Amino acid sequence: MRRCLALLIVSLLALTLTAQTPSEVEITAEPGHHLALENQYVRVFKVEVAPHAATLMHRHRHDYIYVTLGAAHVENDVAGKPPVTISLQDGETHFLPSGFAHIAKNLSDQPFRNITIELMQDEKAHRSPPPKWDEERGLHILNGGTEDILFAKDGARAAELQLQPGGVLPKHHHAGPHLVVAVTDLDLRSDIEGKGASKVQLKAGDVSWEKGGFTHTLTNAGKQNAKLITVEFQ
């Protein structure tokens, strides 16, 4: 009788714990994650969570970079760990390794928005580390702006570029492709060596995939300060 009672109690506890644990979904099935772009290098989601709302418990199976759009105050509930409260600034960019599931709770009165960039070649980079970049961290003072190389992970290098009206990023070469994330509205002019000038116009929160193999200068042709994040690949 005692054995049966003990088994019943254990079963009830297991059922209670199961009921208290949110069911886990893939990131592609999480309603706040909207697929914006996908290729062999990246899978990019535009993320939006309403004020005082939360995502579903979802799993990150790839290392990823996220770019915050607008100031944010969120609670990060990682499965199996205590909740952590985080304050983020507009354009703040971070790298996180994969292998966890979490819920993101928006604690503010404004929508929480970010761009989540999954690095699709992370496992390959773990097995065989890619060549080092010529520079993996550093701040460059430009003519009317700054270029801040933030970090290099999994064969990808992230940088923040800020240009005042008329500010210029000097001539540089893109051997591989790169992703552009517009933190502000962008009205840029790209002067490509051997091809001439072209416009780059994006709204805040837009993303653009650029193929490599070209050399150019980049100028803020607009009347407002321009801020963007680039994630480039070798």
PLM features: residue spans?
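Glycine- and acidic-residue-biased ligand/ion/polar-headgroup-sensing regions
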Residues: R61-A79, H174-G194
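Active-site scaffold segments
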Residues: I65-T68, T93, L179-A182, V207-E210, ...
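Bacterial N-terminal signal peptides
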Residues: A6-T16
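Short, charged beta-turn/beta-strand-edge "cap" motif at the junction between a beta-strand
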Residues: F100-A101, F214-H216
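His-enriched metal-coordination microenvironments in redox/metal-binding proteins
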Residues: H58-H62, H102, N106, H172-G176
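A short, N-terminal "cap"/entry segment at the start of jelly-roll beta-barrel domains
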Residues: Q20-K46, A50-L56, N76-V78, P82-E160, ...
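Positively charged n-region of N-terminal signal peptides that target proteins for export
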Residues: M1-C4
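Short, well-ordered beta-strand segments in beta-rich or mixed alpha/beta enzyme
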Residues: T68-L69, A104, T116, L163, ...
